């Protein structure tokens, strides 16, 4: 009698054979990965042989740089490791961490792409817009969007900025009656989102009044933290493994919330442009704002900009246009709160120029030099973007003779640069005189908006907004620190505080 093909014996034999083959293939794959790990590690060790570093574990890398004290640990290395040191995330992944202005000048003067290993992890969120694009596509998008930040466009934005700021300050008037301090970042983040929506995306209402936008802000905060965690987890570099993880599922949900918001912004503006009156008004404008440029864009081949490209640019600027500014403002306020003499001098300067602040224009922004010096000094101490990463497209030799081969990834630690005692004497001291007009400094010693060809396209927009916010706030409030809640700077895509930024607000009138 023949044994059925479906008999338990035949099935068990087949399963056993399959498991044996799978085990052999699994072991072979593991062996291949181990060899790749070893070879890449040896290549990195050779590439970094001219650059000493703190001790690190052969597999786990520099564990001390992965905690909440990451920024402080980098600063602590500056004295012992001049200019730069290799930072190992794990055994086969390392970056040269740079905090020297001469090194910065060399890297930012080149056309190296953004490091694909780290920045590709942002693609599901912000797509391939200006932040992630490289080469000719980046150049085309940059050239197309630059007119959105022309002075003629920025000048009338001051009124929109002031309107958004006053809404927040009115809310603070009510909160200031309480004895407790308030966490300012959430309020400021909502206000800067309101500003960028009005200025860059032709939004007619106010997101500070509509509570629906808090969901978007929460999603952005979650994505910031999730990206930071993923970059530092060896297993989460694989997209499939990450998607199956709890963090991967959270990231997918947060991305969807962020995309729903930007899709709604794009759809609303498209619907508005269906109105012939609105369309004709826009066509007659000498310069278009950010979103209208995208909607009217024609790429060099004559086709309209794809929906995918359009949303990527909107996602990118929606995030960068509000979150970095919110970080900058929050830390500026904290710096002024902890240095009341400088705060009062700024206030007196603004009062002498603006009176009660009922009217503020573009021309006023160049007439507050001391306030501008204080803003810059706060940006030095607390740069909104603590670091950026490049991947060398060709080998490079630095001014001190040390070199790196093609393919090495370089982290430009802006936080480290700004806290480097060889660049800034007594770097932890708040000293606005560093930015006095006659104060000499290296061209690449101060980089709150990066530098070179890929610097922040909206830096003039951001600086203008910072000046308006600081000026109008100091006319209405005295900022006081909460000594029981000292903020702890935290390395993320954008500089945050682990425990929030709490201030007491004292009404002046």
Swiss-Prot record:
Q: Among the record's GO biological process terms, what is one? A: fatty acid metabolic process
Determine the domain of life of the protein's source.
Eukaryota
The listed locations are: Endoplasmic reticulum membrane; Microsome membrane
Disrupted gene: phenotype observed: Mutant mice are hypertensive due to constitutive activation of renal epithelial sodium channels and increased sodium reabsorption.
Per the entry, what this protein does is:
A cytochrome P450 monooxygenase involved in the metabolism of fatty acids. Catalyzes predominantly the oxidation of the terminal carbon (omega-oxidation) of long-chain fatty acids. Acts as a major omega-hydroxylase for dodecanoic (lauric) acid in liver. In kidney, may play an important role in omega-hydroxylation of (5Z,8Z,11Z,14Z)-eicosatetraenoic acid (arachidonate) to 20-hydroxyeicosatetraenoic acid (20-HETE), a signaling molecule acting both as vasoconstrictive and natriuretic with overall effect on arterial blood pressure.
Query: Kind of enzyme, top EC level?
Result: oxidoreductase
Q: Which residues cross the membrane?
A: 15-35, 121-141
The record's family statement is:
Belongs to the cytochrome P450 family.
Gene Ontology cellular-component annotations: endoplasmic reticulum membrane; intracellular membrane-bounded organelle
Q: In which tissues does this protein get expressed?
A: Highly expressed in the kidneys of both genders.
How this chain sits in the membrane, per its record, is:
Multi-pass membrane protein
Q: Which residues carry this modification: Phosphoserine?
A: 439
* Gene3D superfamilies associated with the record: Cytochrome P450
The alphabetical list of record keywords is: Endoplasmic reticulum, Fatty acid metabolism, Heme, Iron, Lipid metabolism, Membrane, Metal-binding, Microsome, Monooxygenase, NADP, Oxidoreductase, Phosphoprotein, Transmembrane, Transmembrane helix
Instruction: Name the catalysed reactions.
Output: an omega-methyl-long-chain fatty acid + reduced [NADPH--hemoprotein reductase] + O2 = an omega-hydroxy-long-chain fatty acid + oxidized [NADPH--hemoprotein reductase] + H2O + H(+); dodecanoate + reduced [NADPH--hemoprotein reductase] + O2 = 12-hydroxydodecanoate + oxidized [NADPH--hemoprotein reductase] + H2O + H(+); dodecanoate + reduced [NADPH--hemoprotein reductase] + O2 = 11-hydroxydodecanoate + oxidized [NADPH--hemoprotein reductase] + H2O + H(+); tetradecanoate + reduced [NADPH--hemoprotein reductase] + O2 = 14-hydroxytetradecanoate + oxidized [NADPH--hemoprotein reductase] + H2O + H(+)
Q: What is its EC number?
A: 1.14.14.80
Name the cofactor(s) required for activity, per the record: heme
| Record protein name field | Cytochrome P450 4A10
- What is the predominant subcellular site recorded for this chain? endoplasmic reticulum
GO MF terms listed in the record are: arachidonate omega-hydroxylase activity; heme binding; iron ion binding; long-chain fatty acid omega-hydroxylase activity; monooxygenase activity
């Amino acid at each position: 009698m023949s044994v059925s093909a479906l008999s338990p014996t035949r099935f068990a034999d087949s399963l056993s054979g399959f498991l044996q083959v799978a085990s052999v293939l699994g072991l072979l794959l593991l062996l291949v990965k181990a060899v790749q790990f070893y070879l890449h590690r040896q290549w990195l060790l050779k590439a970094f042989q001219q650059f000493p570093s703190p001790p690190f574990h052969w597999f786990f890398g520099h564990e001390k740089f992965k905690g909440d004290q990451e920024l402080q640990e980098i600063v602590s290395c500056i004295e012992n490791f001049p200019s730069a040191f290799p930072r190992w995330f794990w055994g086969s992944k390392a970056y040269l961490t740079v905090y020297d202005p001469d090194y910065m000048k060399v890297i930012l003067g080149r056309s190296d792409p953004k490091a694909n290993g780290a920045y590709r992890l942002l693609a599901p969120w912000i797509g391939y817009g200006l932040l992630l694009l490289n080469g000719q596509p980046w150049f085309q998008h940059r050239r197309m969007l630059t007119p959105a930040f022309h002075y003629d466009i920025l000048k009338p934005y001051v009124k929109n900025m002031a309107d958004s700021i006053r809404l927040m300050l009115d809310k603070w008037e009510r909160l200031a009656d309480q004895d407790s301090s308030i966490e300012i970042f959430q309020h400021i983040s909502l206000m800067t989102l309101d500003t960028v929506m009005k200025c860059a995306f032709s939004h007619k209402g106010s997101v500070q009044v509509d509570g629906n936008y808090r969901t978007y802000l929460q999603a952005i905060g979650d994505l910031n933290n999730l990206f930071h965690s993923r970059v530092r987890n060896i297993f989460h570099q694989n997209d499939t493994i990450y998607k199956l993880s709890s963090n991967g599922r959270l990231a997918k949900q947060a991305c969807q919330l962020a995309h729903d918001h930007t899709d709604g912004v794009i759809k609303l503006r498209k619907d508005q442009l269906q109105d012939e009156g609105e369309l004709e008004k826009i066509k007659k404008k000498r310069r278009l704002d950010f979103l209208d440029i995208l909607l009217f864009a024609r790429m060099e081949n004559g086709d309209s900009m794809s929906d995918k490209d359009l949303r990527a640019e909107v996602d990118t600027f929606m995030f960068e246009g509000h979150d970095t500014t919110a970080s900058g403002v929050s830390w500026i306020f904290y710096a002024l709160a902890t240095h009341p003499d400088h705060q009062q001098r700024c206030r007196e300067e603004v009062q002498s120029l603006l009176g009660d602040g009922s009217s503020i224009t573009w021309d006023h922004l160049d007439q507050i030099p001391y306030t501008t010096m204080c803003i810059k000094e706060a940006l030095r101490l607390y740069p909104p973007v603590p670091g950026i990463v490049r991947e060398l497209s060709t080998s490079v030799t630095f001014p001190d003779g040390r070199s790196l081969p093609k393919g090495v990834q370089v982290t430009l630690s802006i936080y480290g640069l700004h806290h480097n005692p060889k660049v800034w004497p007594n770097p932890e001291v708040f000293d606005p005189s560093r930015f006095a007009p006659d104060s000499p400094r290296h061209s690449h010693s101060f980089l709150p908006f990066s530098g070179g060809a890929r610097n922040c396209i909206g830096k003039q927009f951001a600086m203008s907004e910072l000046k308006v916010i600081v000026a109008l706030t100091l006319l209405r409030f005295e900022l006081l620190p909460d000594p029981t809640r000292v903020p702890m700077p935290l390395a993320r895509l954008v500089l945050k505080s682990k425990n929030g930024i709490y201030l007491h607000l004292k009404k002046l009138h």
